[in-house]
Amino acid sequence: IDLARKNGVAAYTGDGTNRWPAANTYDIGVLYRLALEKAPAGSTLHGVGDTGIARKVIAETIADMLGIGTQSITDDQAPQYLGFLATYAGLDNPTSNDKTRTLLGWQPTHPGWVEDVQKGHYFA
């Protein structure tokens, strides 16, 4: 968000169809508790509520909230526009939470990333 403000555009790499998982912090808090109470030692859990949000949708949501445009950028431009996230910007990372939900009975119940960001509290 800060880099989008600074650069005047919310950027994404390529066509923006690559996906990132996300989760509401309140849902993650519940997941941590359930993991401590129920998960077998060494379990691999995926705490994601949104199993894959297109990077272009992420950029559009940020742009709408800031009143700026979006821009597709190259991988070479990514560090300027995305900072440390540039390393991950081109990855397509849809992530299933099926195992986590089944093993722990966990169910994300809070707003997803887009809805949460649209509330505006990340932009104060």
Question: Which residues does each PLM region occupy?
Answer:
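A conserved pocket-lining segment of Rossmann-fold NAD(P)-dependent short-chain dehydrogenase/reductase
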Residues: 2-26, 31
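Residues that recognize and position ribonucleotide moieties
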Residues: 21, 51, 93
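An acidic site on a long C-lobe helix of protein kinase domains
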Residues: 24-27, 54, 112
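Conserved C-terminal active-site "lid" loop/helix of NAD(P)H-dependent oxidoreductases
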Residues: 25, 56, 60, 79-107
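Mid/C-terminal beta-alpha module of Rossmann-like enzyme folds, strongest
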Residues: 31-85
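Residues within well-ordered alpha-helical secondary structure of globular protein domains
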Residues: 34, 64, 106, 119-122
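Amphipathic terminal alpha-helices
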Residues: 111-124
